[in-house]
């Protein structure tokens, strides 16, 4: 329904737009297409808006998101603004109701005006729904043991945790109930006492059991009435799972925490669900936490873990005012499925550090506390086994959870400076390093804005740190990598991982303070983790130092190499020329020797000083020698032009590895340039630059040059041969023309005297050969050749057209004659040049019968028209003479005839005259029209 309705509205809007643009009507198909385009466009725009809003942590787009979406689609906001100002807006014809109809909210969030709305903490963003009161949340948590994922359950734990945390901090009695988390210990016990408790508890698991830690769900239960029994605590842990992740973690958390949890539940039993249980609890939780710390965060010593957790200020630790806020979020995190796992990890972390334990207690449900109270003796003995089992479970869960969490790996292990990215960094060397502290601060800031996954950012952070630490410890134990990453792991476990980052700041500071105390902890896992972390840190430091040293050494080497190259270039400049004369094959040998002699080691301080002095001297020498060697260089340049070109190409790529650089840079041709090039090249060129490989390359280059030269020479020779052939052909043609002229002179002495164009007549003969080409070129419309074998003996005589036309016909045959013809006025006919090209290709005298048809055309009325091969003009009535052999008719002036020859005498055209000197022909045909 919605789609069809929206499409109908879009169709109306398309019609309105078309109407506004001046269209009176639109075809239905065009309207459908435009509607489809508009629909897709709006969908793309809306999709971009939502993606940008989600990218910036909002659920609904704002104008900024719309602007970003427009820019993404290539729409300029300034142009759009101008468009809106210049075009009148068209209002929709009728009012559009909001659709689809909104449905009732099933999430059961409290109304904004309810009592909980006033208790919204500063760190809770406004876009998050109101939080249920702590009592209501406790009731809800009791009911959902399965770890429901309702947003309500998620949110309720946050505020309840904060309230409970404050209560626990005030009352130590609550410590035995549900508030066995380490936040109370962290606040109440001084930093020194915590490490002691941790170390003592680390030694004895029983102490840890005493302060059983509540799973993350137990933190949620804190908001539930403090009177929750241990069983109730378990339920609350189940409730904490209401968030999707907690249910998976809950089983592991219960298995890991059962021994430690009974104590915690006892302390929690009163309203002490908050982590502010008595310091005794904290001490207990640290003990239990130590084993989990071993499992979950082997890298961190129990103390470090507690410090990290405290530092994050997960709101459960009374020490930091931020901790209460964090606790509020922590209850929400218990809702996440991972919270149960976090609970065991929380117990472990409590052993490690009281603050960490407090945070984790919130995460662990009262169940853990009950289990701890019941199983205190068992947990001391079984703590290690349970830890291992919990580790396995945590690992499995972490694997399952990590898949959805894009932040885990990216945020965690790989960048030391980024605490957000990986818990490993925080847990490991980074906790001690200022980077970790900075990252922790960043996390606290991010925590202030709760992530969508976690009801409260800090609470989710705590829960994440618990589960993440356990998962990380297990993973590290398997991989042998430090487990300090666990505190940041919450990010890995769920999308809310990023918000928990605020905790790391406190954790980093606390870890720094507690790290020495963690040394006291004797457990092997912790020690191994610490040693691993230290080793890693040392290795990183060493690598950094090495990198720095390498950079420094590289810079020094570059400077040295530059100086060396300059010196060697100057020293070897002239020797090169000598060597090249003697050994042109290996022009670089001298250079190689020079570089080998000058080693960076030898060229240290003394070398640098000497080099500078030598450079100045070399410069002077170069200037003096430069003048003398200009002549030599010019000669070499002429010889080595190819080399220089190649050398120039390698010189610019100074970036290439020195080994790859080609020696050609130092070729004799470029020897003069070498001093200028050396300073830039030296840093790039290593001592090994001049090796056999380079020699081979040089040889290959030389070969290539030689081959290229040979090819060029061959091409030149070919060209020269062709030119010579052309010249020969031209000479032959000229000779033939001269022969024709002589023959004509003998046959017709009259022609020579009247017109000086007789030599051109011979050219005409050549032109007459290719009648086809000439016919095409004939400028006169009648000049088109028509096949006809009949020819009147005397075409109608016409006034002599002047000797010019005669020149044109001969000109086509030889190129030089063409030039002469051009000088004369007879160049008018364009056929001349075309004929010349054709004549050059074809034999000079080749066609007898073809010529007949070529120069005879039939007009529209069927009359035959003869074309003069000499001038390529049709019969114009002027006197013409016909060749007794080829039947071509020439104007008298074109052939140099002034008076009619006797009829008994045969007359041959210039073409035939040469062919038939000694032959007798039929009667001469001569007619004057």
Swiss-Prot record:
Positions of crosslink type Glycyl lysine isopeptide (Lys-Gly) (interchain with G-Cter in SUMO2): 581, 746
Protein name: Transcription initiation factor TFIID subunit 3
Bias (Pro residues): 793-804
Keyword Zinc attached: yes
Gene3D superfamilies: Histone, subunit A, Zinc/RING finger domain, C3HC4 (zinc finger)
Assembly behavior: Component of the TFIID basal transcription factor complex, composed of TATA-box-binding protein TBP, and a number of TBP-associated factors (TAFs), including TAF1, TAF2, TAF3, TAF4, TAF5, TAF6, TAF7, TAF8, TAF9, TAF10, TAF11, TAF12 and TAF13. Interacts with TAF10 via the histone fold. Interacts with TAF13, TBP, SAP130 and GCN5L2. Interacts with TBPL2.
Biased composition annotated in UniProt, kind: Basic residues: 523-537, 702-713
Ranges of biased composition (kind: Polar residues): 340-358, 434-466
SMART domains per UniProt: BTP, PHD
Keywords: Acetylation, Isopeptide bond, Metal-binding, Nucleus, Phosphoprotein, Transcription, Transcription regulation, Ubl conjugation, Zinc, Zinc-finger
GO cellular component, one term: nuclear membrane
Subcellular location: Nucleus
Function recorded in the entry: The TFIID basal transcription factor complex plays a major role in the initiation of RNA polymerase II (Pol II)-dependent transcription. TFIID recognizes and binds promoters with or without a TATA box via its subunit TBP, a TATA-box-binding protein, and promotes assembly of the pre-initiation complex (PIC). The TFIID complex consists of TBP and TBP-associated factors (TAFs), including TAF1, TAF2, TAF3, TAF4, TAF5, TAF6, TAF7, TAF8, TAF9, TAF10, TAF11, TAF12 and TAF13. The TFIID complex structure can be divided into 3 modules TFIID-A, TFIID-B, and TFIID-C.
Amino-acid positions noted as binding Zn(2+) 1 in the UniProt annotation, renumbered to this chain: 868, 871, 891, 894
Region (Disordered): 131-152, 176-197, 221-358, 405-578, 603-658, 692-748, 778-807
Phosphothreonine carried by residues: 501
Zinc finger (PHD-type): 865-915
GO biological process: maintenance of protein location in nucleus; mRNA transcription by RNA polymerase II; negative regulation of signal transduction by p53 class mediator; negative regulation of transcription by RNA polymerase II; positive regulation of transcription by RNA polymerase II; positive regulation of transcription initiation by RNA polymerase II; RNA polymerase II preinitiation complex assembly
This protein's domain notes: The PHD-type zinc finger mediates binding to histone H3 methyllysine at position 4 (H3K4me3).
Binding site for Zn(2+) 2: 883, 886, 909, 912
Gene: TAF3
Family: Belongs to the TAF3 family.
Compositionally biased region (Low complexity): 265-288, 778-787
């Amino acid at each position: 329904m919605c789609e069809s309705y929206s499409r109908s509205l879009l169709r109306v809007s398309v019609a309105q737009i078309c109407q506004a643009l001046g269209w009176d009507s639109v075809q239905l198909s065009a309207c459908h297409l435009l509607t489809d385009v508009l629909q897709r466009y709006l969908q793309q725009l809306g999709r971009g808006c939502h993606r940008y809003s989600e990218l910036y942590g909002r659920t609904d787009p704002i104008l900024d998101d719309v602007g970003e979406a427009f820019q993404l689609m290539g729409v300029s906001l300034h142009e759009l603004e101008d468009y809106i100002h210049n075009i009148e807006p068209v209002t929709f014809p009728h009012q559009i109701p909001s659709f689809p109809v909104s449905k009732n909210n099933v999430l059961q969030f409290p109304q904004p005006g309810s009592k909980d709305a006033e208790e919204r903490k500063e760190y809770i963003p406004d876009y998050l729904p109101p939080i249920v009161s702590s009592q209501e949340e406790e009731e809800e948590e009791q009911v959902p043991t399965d770890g429901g994922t309702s947003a309500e359950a998620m949110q309720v734990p946050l505020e309840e945790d904060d309230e409970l945390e404050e209560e626990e901090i005030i009352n130590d009695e609550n410590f035995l109930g549900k508030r066995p988390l380490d936040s109370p210990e962290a606040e109440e016990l001084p930093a020194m006492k915590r490490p002691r408790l941790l170390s003592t508890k680390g030694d004895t698991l029983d102490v840890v059991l005493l302060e059983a830690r509540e799973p993350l769900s137990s933190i949620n239960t804190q908001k539930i009435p403090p009177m929750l029994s241990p069983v109730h605590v378990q339920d609350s842990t189940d409730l904490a799972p209401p968030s999707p992740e907690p249910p998976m973690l809950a089983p592991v958390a219960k298995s890991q925490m059962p021994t430690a949890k009974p104590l915690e539940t006892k302390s929690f039993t009163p309203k002490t669900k908050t982590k502010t249980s008595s310091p005794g609890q904290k001490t207990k939780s640290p003990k239990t936490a130590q084993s989990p710390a071993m499992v979950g965060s082997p890298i961190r010593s129990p103390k470090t873990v507690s410090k990290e957790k405290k530092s994050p200020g997960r709101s459960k630790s009374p020490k930091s005012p931020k901790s209460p806020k964090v606790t509020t979020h922590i209850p929400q995190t218990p809702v996440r499925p991972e919270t149960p796992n976090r609970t065991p990890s929380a117990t472990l972390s409590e052993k490690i550090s009281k603050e960490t334990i407090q945070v984790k207690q919130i995460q662990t449900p009262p169940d853990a506390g009950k289990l701890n109270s019941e199983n205190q003796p068992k947990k001391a003995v079984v703590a290690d086994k349970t830890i291992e089992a919990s580790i396995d479970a945590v690992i499995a869960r972490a694997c399952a959870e990590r898949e959805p969490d894009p932040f885990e790996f990216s945020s965690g292990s790989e960048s030391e400076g980024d605490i957000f990215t990986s818990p490993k960094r925080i847990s490991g060397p980074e906790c001690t390093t200022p980077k970790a502290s900075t990252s922790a601060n960043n996390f606290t800031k991010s925590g202030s804005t709760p992530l969508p996954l976690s009801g409260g950012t800090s609470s989710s952070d705590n829960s994440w740190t618990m589960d993440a630490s356990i998962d990380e410890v297990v993973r590290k134990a398997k991989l042998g990598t430090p487990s300090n990453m666990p505190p940041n792991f919450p990010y890995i476990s769920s999308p809310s991982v990023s918000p928990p980052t605020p905790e790391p700041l406190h954790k980093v500071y606390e870890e720094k303070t507690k790290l020495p105390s963690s040394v006291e902890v004797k457990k092997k896992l912790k020690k191994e983790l610490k040693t691993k972390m230290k080793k890693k840190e040392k290795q990183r430091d060493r690598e950094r130092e090495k990198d720095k040293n390498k950079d420094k050494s590289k810079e020094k080497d570059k400077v040295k190499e530059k100086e060396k190259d300059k010196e060697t270039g100057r020293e070897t400049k002239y020797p090169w020329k000598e060597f090249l004369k003697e050994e042109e094959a290996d022009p670089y040998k001298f250079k190689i020797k020079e570089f080998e002699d000058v080693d960076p080691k030898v060229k240290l301080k003394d070398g640098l000083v000497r080099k500078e002095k030598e450079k100045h001297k070399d410069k002077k020498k170069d200037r003096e020698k430069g003048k003398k060697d200009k002549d030599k260089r010019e000669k070499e340049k002429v010889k080595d032009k190819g080399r220089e070109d190649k050398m120039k190409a390698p010189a610019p790529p100074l970036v290439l590895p020195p080994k790859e650089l080609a020696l050609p840079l130092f070729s004799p041709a470029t020897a003069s340039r070498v001093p200028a090039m050396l300073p830039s090249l030296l840093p790039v060129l290593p001592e090994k630059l001049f090796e056999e490989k380079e020699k081979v390359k040089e040889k290959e280059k030389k070969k290539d040059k030689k081959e290229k030269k040979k090819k060029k020479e061959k091409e030149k020779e070919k060209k020269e041969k062709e030119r010579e052939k052309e010249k020969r052909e031209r000479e032959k043609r000229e000779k033939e023309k001269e022969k024709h002229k002589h023959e004509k002179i003998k046959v017709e002495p009259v022609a020579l005297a009247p017109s000086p164009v007789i030599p051109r007549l011979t050219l005409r003969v050549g032109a007459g050969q290719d009648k086809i080409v000439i016919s095409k070129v004939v400028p006169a419309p009648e000049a088109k050749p028509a096949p006809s074998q009949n020819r009147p003996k005397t075409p109608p005589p016409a006034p002599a057209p002047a000797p010019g036309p005669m020149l044109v016909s001969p000109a086509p045959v030889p190129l030089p004659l063409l030039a002469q013809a051009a000088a004369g006025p007879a160049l008018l006919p364009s056929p001349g040049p075309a004929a010349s090209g054709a004549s050059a290709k074809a034999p000079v005298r080749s066609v007898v019968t073809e010529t007949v048809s070529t120069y005879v055309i039939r007009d529209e009325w069927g009359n035959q028209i003869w074309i003069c091969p000499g001038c390529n003009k049709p019969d114009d009535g002027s006197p013409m003479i016909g060749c007794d052999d080829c039947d071509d008719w020439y104007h008298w002036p074109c052939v140099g005839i002034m008076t009619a020859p006797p009829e008994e005498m045969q007359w041959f055209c210039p073409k035939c005259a040469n062919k038939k000197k000694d032959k007798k022909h039929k009667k001469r045909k001569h007619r004057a029209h």
